[in-house]
Design a protein with these regions (language model features):
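Contiguous transmembrane helix-bundle modules in multi-pass membrane proteins
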Residues: 14-21, 71, 75-201
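Interfacial and helix-entry/exit segments of alpha-helical transmembrane bundles
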Residues: 40-57, 117-130
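Interfacial helix-loop-helix junctions of multi-pass membrane proteins
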Residues: 1-15, 67-74
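Membrane-interfacial alpha-helical segments at the cytosolic side of multi-pass membrane proteins
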Residues: 21-34
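Hydrophobic residues within membrane-embedded alpha-helical segments of Major Facilitator Superfamily
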Residues: 24, 49, 56, 63, ...
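Transmembrane helix-loop boundary segments of multi-pass membrane transporters
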Residues: 5-18, 39-46, 158, 165
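Mobile "lid/hinge" segments at catalytic clefts and subdomain interfaces of large enzymes
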Residues: 52-58, 62-64, 68-69, 87-96
Length: 201
């Protein structure tokens, strides 16, 4: 079970990691999409998030099926890795092209004026989730570049991910608790502190 059961609970295996990255990005996208629907903000950020979320799913399939990383869950299947990498490159270029064609639309995005409003908490939520996804991505692909440059295998263990990701997710939990009591409009800082102290107590 420890080997075949996805690390027993969670072992930061490369294939586990690449399945975790789209989940983090999708969660961020769902939250920021609400800000776009309600207040017409974050248009360009949502386009960026939606694009890399889709690309991360192709990347995850590439890692799983190409055999470029050692994992108990990875399995290669002929030359499918080349096709997946080609598809990843194609959709990346398409994503950049479509974005460049819609610059005027992104410019219509409204600025966030409520410092202690829900949109600000959505941004903080997004930053934590995005940075977490970025750290997981770097920790997962770094061994590939290390082996290419130095011809030596490198494994990044769960200690790295626990130390780097744990505090971010802990802050995220606190934001989730407080943001449920935040109104859409701006609040006075003193009232915001008082309301959230009541929640903690």
């Amino acid at each position: 079970y420890e080997v075949l059961g996805w690390g027993g609970y969670w072992a930061w295996d490369p294939v586990e990691n690449v399945s975790f990255i789209p989940w983090l990005l999708a969660t961020a996208f769902l939250h920021s999409s609400k800000a776009q629907l309600n207040e017409s903000t974050l248009l360009n950020w949502n386009y960026f998030l939606g694009g890399i979320m889709f690309l991360s799913t192709i990347f995850g399939t590439f890692i799983t099926r190409s055999g470029v990383l050692i994992s108990v869950h990875a399995f290669s299947n002929g030359n499918i890795g080349i096709f997946l990498l080609t598809g990843l490159a194609f959709f990346t270029l398409f994503f950049l092209y479509a974005g460049s064609k819609n610059i005027k639309y992104f410019a219509t995005s409204k600025k966030i004026t409520h410092i202690l409003g829900k949109s600000s908490f959505f941004i903080a939520n997004n930053m934590l989730l995005f940075v977490s996804a970025l750290i997981v991505f770097i920790g997962t692909v770094y061994p590939i570049f290390y082996e290419t440059l130095y011809q030596r295998q490198l494994t990044i263990g769960r200690t790295f991910f626990d130390i780097m990701i744990g505090p971010l997710l802990l802050v995220l939990v606190f934001l989730m608790i407080f943001s449920t009591k935040i109104s859409v409009k701006n609040l006075k800082f003193k009232k915001w502190i008082t309301d959230n102290l009541k929640i903690v107590n």
